[in-house]
Amino acid sequence: MSEQNNTEMAFQIQRIYTKDVSFEAPNAPHVFQKDWQPEVKLDLDTASTQLADDVYEVVLRVTVTASLGEETAFLCEVQQGGIFSISGIEGTQMAHCLGAYCPNILFPYARECITSLVSRGTFPQLNLAPVNFDALFMNYLQQQAGEGTEEHQDA
């Protein structure tokens, strides 16, 4: 066999944790007496930090705002963190891992936390749809490449 500089990729979840939680219902209790037809806004953000060689913290911030007209019914924010051991990849592959793969792992935990908080606030059940972090990451890369560049698709 020919000699290759073949570093094997390794990925391990060390810990998943809730880093920060906030729930506000600024217009309770009178908001409970209104017809429940909210406008729900979902904001997502990710951040990653290298903690040590091959050890990274990824934080997924999920903010949900439900409004009835001009009034905020509730505002819920969860920062779901994870510590991951990742080795054998670099560059765009590492950026994809930290910006899409890890958030895909963290999102169900954040979604469950938000659902629980909304329920404890006695609001109707909130079911957040799955998020395609791979597509969001690709959009981010395209934005970074600048407007007017040709789109590339992976085969």
UniProtKB/Swiss-Prot annotation:
Pfam families: SecB (PF02556)
Highest taxon above the source species: Bacteria
Main location: cytoplasm
Keywords: Chaperone, Cytoplasm, Protein transport, Translocation, Transport
UniProt KW Cytoplasm keyword: yes
GO cellular component: cytoplasm
GO MF annotations in UniProt: unfolded protein binding
CDD domains: Translocase_SecB
InterPro entries noted in UniProt: SecB (IPR003708), SecB-like_sf (IPR035958)
Compartment(s) of residence: Cytoplasm
GO annotation terms (biological process): protein folding; protein tetramerization; protein transport
Sequence similarity: Belongs to the SecB family.
Subunit structure as annotated in this protein's UniProt entry: Homotetramer, a dimer of dimers. One homotetramer interacts with 1 SecA dimer.
Reported function: One of the proteins required for the normal export of preproteins out of the cell cytoplasm. It is a molecular chaperone that binds to a subset of precursor proteins, maintaining them in a translocation-competent state. It also specifically binds to its receptor SecA.
Protein name as it appears in the record: Protein-export protein SecB
